[in-house]
Design a protein with these regions (language model features):
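Alpha-helical transmembrane segments in inner-membrane proteins
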Residues: 1-340
């Protein structure tokens, strides 16, 4: 099997992603024909008024930015999950294994509860708090893991990450008990939602995925070496500690940005890489790009279900991913135990 996908394969991935995005833009409480959707988008790009009867505002200003943000978050979370599973050699690992998702959620909840803002930006305070707490969480977890084992052993990182996530979850629930007027909005956000996100979020998510995704993909060869064990990776010239720190920090930054925009969305980084591995195989030079495309499509479909299943009531996207992910988690866990 080739190390990289052919241009034809990438073209198929892109077409599948565009088809999913078109479906999500067209379908909703108000259905819009694909032709009208394309007309509205082209008119917006060219700065021309849309023909009468075309819901340009709904398409261009509401659905399109949301769909783009959903795709970017899905791609980012899935990429982080694939990287963590390769780095930690654990099929049950994803970005949240580090406890970084929980830490970022705590920072964002504190910002929302206290009304932390930055002049000129409605969401800048939440994003900075989420990223800051993601870094603090990573620093704390790695410090504790290093204290237990100077080699930063995988089992130590996972164990401390899980314990930290449970502790942070309790702290978040404690905070929610003191913010009466904001409990509903914060609780909905913590379950994952991209409702109300716009193009500024798209620019931030795109930049984060471009920079952090580039770093992760550049370590694909090292992640392949980790598959045969850390000792063997050292023997083939991999600086294990440097690669671990680089990937862990990059994953933390990317997760922090995603959580600040979408809230905590579970199971994407756990389930999607396994599905992508069935298509692309274990080679991370193929697996990482496949995971990004698959993650984007998966979260787009989950968001579509969340918007339309009980319309006009909108479900949290995290509810949908958890329902699917919980079943998949049990299957993955059973297979891992059976194989082990």
């Amino acid at each position: 099997m080739a190390d990289h996908f052919s241009l034809r394969t990438y073209a198929l991935f892109i077409l599948a992603l565009l088809a999913a995005m078109m479906l999500c833009v067209c379908v909703g409480s108000v259905s819009v024909a694909p032709k009208d959707t394309l007309t509205a988008i082209f008119c917006a790009l060219l700065g021309k008024p849309a023909p009468a009867g075309v819901a340009k505002n709904i398409i261009v200003n509401v659905r399109l930015p949301r769909v783009m943000n959903v795709a970017l978050v899905g791609a980012s979370l899935s990429l982080c999950g694939a990287a963590m599973q390769g780095l930690l050699r654990n099929p049950l690992a994803d970005g949240s294994t580090l406890g970084v998702s929980a830490g970022a959620s705590l920072g964002a909840v504190i910002a929302l509860a206290l009304g932390v803002t930055i002049p000129g930006s409605d969401y800048g305070g939440t994003m900075l708090m989420a990223m800051a707490f993601a870094f603090l969480s990573l620093t704390l977890i790695l410090s504790l893991a290093y204290a237990l084992d100077h080699s930063l052993a995988t089992n130590s990182i996972i164990l401390i990450g899980v314990i930290f996530s449970m502790f942070v979850s309790s702290v978040i629930n404690l905070i929610l008990s003191f913010v009466n007027d904001q409990v509903r909005s914060i609780a909905f956000w913590t379950m994952g939602s991209l409702s109300g996100t716009g193009y500024p979020h798209t620019r931030i998510l795109s930049l984060a995925l471009l920079l952090c995704g580039g770093v992760i993909v550049r370590h694909a060869r090292e992640l392949n070496a980790f598959a045969i064990g850390e000792d063997n990776a050292r023997h083939v010239g991999v600086n294990v500690r440097r690669v671990k720190l680089a990937v862990l920090v990059t994953v933390s930054v990317l997760i922090g940005v995603c959580v600040s925009v979408s809230g905590s969305i579970g199971f994407v980084g756990l389930v999607v890489p396994h599905a992508a591995r069935m298509i692309a195989g274990p080679n991370h030079r193929r697996l990482l790009p496949a995971s990004m495309f698959a993650g984007a499509i998966f979260l787009l479909l989950a968001d579509l279900i969340a918007r339309t299943l009980l319309s006009p009531v909108e479900l949290s996207i995290g509810v949908v991913t958890s329902l699917v992910g919980a079943v998949a988690f049990v299957v993955i866990f059973y297979r891992a135990r059976k194989a082990g």
